[in-house]
A protein has these predicted regions:
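Membrane-interfacial loop-to-helix junctions in multi-pass transporters
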Residues: 3-7, 73-80, 108-122, 155-161, ...
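Membrane-interface alpha-helices at helix entry/exit sites of multi-pass transporters
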Residues: 104, 113-122, 153-166, 193-198, ...
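Interfacial loop-to-helix junctions that mark the boundaries of transmembrane helices
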Residues: 1-5, 22-24, 53-58, 65-78, ...
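Long, contiguous bundles of hydrophobic transmembrane helices that form the permeation core
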Residues: 2-14, 18, 31-38, 42, ...
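Core transmembrane alpha-helical segments of multi-pass membrane transporters/permeases
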Residues: 32, 52-100, 271, 275-334
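Alpha-helical transmembrane segments and, especially, the helix-loop junctions at the ends
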Residues: 127-144, 149, 154-194, 211-215, ...
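Hydrophobic alpha-helical transmembrane segments of multi-pass integral membrane proteins
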Residues: 82-85, 111-147, 316-320, 343-381, ...
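Short amphipathic alpha-helical coupling elements at transmembrane boundaries
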Residues: 70, 101-111, 150-154, 297-308, ...
Length: 461
């Protein structure tokens, strides 16, 4: 009975939050109110409000405010500072004419490609490869928004389609050595090499190709439906005085991430890399004019871009975190796990149930890790008791958690991309919905075809 009540409360609040965001209310305010309401109800029900890693203040009421403080410090510090630095960097690149020079140079070879959607798919594959270097979905999305997004928009790709491309690369896990894959390999009782390279990677590649095709047709359909015209920017209208080599500057963060990864050079945080990139750009600006005042005034544009990012993106991330914690503390995720364990032992049925519940948990909490970490702990027990191959259950769940995050209006990557693109999170979700569902279907079908469903088939007994 308690499980039903927790689920009901979670669903009611989720529906209410979605309704008011769709009606045009501030997403930050709505998520804050929804999250605080859930935390208050959790406290009344006797649930612990703060994560287990945080010490209680001694009172539930102040614990709620304490959690907001924790999020402000964590998301306003590490992740938030990264987002603000990237937004400031993007604003500075526009100010000094580097983005204009990228468009001016790129327009010459790109004019031979008539379809902006082919360019969009090429950008999607590049973005997916970038996920090998940047493990954070939000970090990757923000990095792509600061680098690829302006280029895509300026060569004729709609803002919604370009935002969807930046939000969806991390929907499928491609990196064989990510923490999720290592944990999944353990739960599947397989070596990392066999699980990551021989089993998961082929399924991931198939899903990425399917999602790319879906992006092509879905974005084109939505653009036609919304009467969005595609016009290449007339390069003759670009009057930038920046030298041609400035075209490389917007991509220096990506180059830095690839170089300073601990293999080719020292492993540096992306914020450190961004500081280096900003210093290089400002030094070049000084060498062009030898005008210190002009350089300092230009950097003010970057600082204002950082401030705008705090108001439009970082605070939205904090509000989304409060909402996700509210769903977690009220027992919403644990209730979903209880439902999963109540189903029978038929392999395909159990796999589909786990996939659906993992997707639902990821959509509602906005986290790709938390639902998978919560569900994966019970995989060995479920598999052994049912005679099912653990990998048969783990692989679809692993991908479903990340796919579900891309459909969540409170996930960091969707919120950050929507904020930087200045569109609604629901517009991003609409744009990614069909490609994500296509990817999910491919993952399920490929798992059914490539991974043995029973433990006996694996052991040969």
């Amino acid at each position: 009975m308690l499980t039903f009540i927790e689920l009901l409360i979670g669903v009611v609040v989720i529906v209410g939050v979605a309704r008011y965001i769709i009606k045009g209310y501030s997403a930050t305010g709505v998520l804050f109110v929804g999250g605080l309401l859930l935390l208050i109800i959790s406290a009344i029900m006797g649930h612990k409000v703060l994560p287990s890693s945080q010490a209680s203040t001694g009172y539930s009421a102040t614990d709620i405010v304490e959690y907001v403080k924790i999020l402000l410090m964590s998301r306003g510090g590490d992740l938030g500072m990264m987002i603000m630095m990237l937004c400031g960097f993007a604003a500075y690149m526009t100010h000094i004419g580097a983005n204009d020079m990228v468009v001016k140079l790129a327009s010459k070879p790109l004019q031979y490609i008539n379809s902006p959607y082919l360019l969009m798919i090429a950008a999607y594959f590049v973005a997916c490869l970038m996920s090998l270097a940047v493990s954070s979905a939000t970090g990757l999305g923000v990095l792509l928004m600061a680098t690829l997004f302006p280029v895509m928009v300026n060569v004729g790709i709609s803002r919604g389609a370009a935002a969807a491309i930046c939000a969806s690369p991390a929907a499928i896990i491609l990196a064989p050595t990510s923490g999720d894959v290592v944990l999944a390999a353990q739960a599947s009782e397989m070596s990392l090499i066999d699980f990551a390279f021989k089993t998961t990677l082929p399924i991931s590649i198939a899903a990425i190709i399917g999602m790319a095709i879906a992006h092509f047709f879905w974005q084109r359909y939505l653009d036609k439906k919304e009467h969005i015209s595609h016009e290449m920017l007339d390069v003759s209208e670009i009057t930038t005085t920046a030298p041609a080599f400035y075209a490389i500057l917007p991509f220096t963060p990506i180059i830095g991430v690839l170089i300073f990864d601990g293999k080719w050079g020292p492993q540096l945080h992306i914020i450190t890399i961004l500081v280096i990139c900003m210093l290089i750009a400002s030094i070049l600006e000084f060498l062009r004019s030898f005008n210190t005042q002009k350089v300092f005034s230009g950097l003010e544009v970057a600082y204002r871009g950082m401030a705008d990012a705090f108001a439009n993106v970082v605070m939205l991330l904090v509000a989304a975190g409060v909402f996700a914690q509210g769903l977690s503390t009220i027992g919403f995720i644990q209730s979903l796990i209880s439902i999963a364990t109540s189903f029978g032992s038929a392999s395909i049925i159990l796999m589909l149930v786990l996939v659906i519940l993992t997707m639902l948990a990821a959509v509602t909490t906005g986290s790709g890790n938390a639902p998978f970490y919560a569900f994966v702990e019970m995989i060995p027990k479920l598999a052994h008791s049912s005679g099912i191959n653990p990998a048969y259950l783990t692989i679809p769940m692993l991908q479903a958690s990340n796919l579900g995050r891309t459909l969540s209006p409170v996930s960091g990557v969707v919120v950050a991309v929507a904020g930087m693109a200045k569109i609604s999170p629901f517009e991003v979700i609409k744009r990614t919905s069909v490609p994500v569902l296509v990817g999910l279907v491919i993952v399920i079908v490929a798992t059914e075809l490539m991974v043995p469903g029973t433990a006996a088939a694996v052991t040969g007994k």
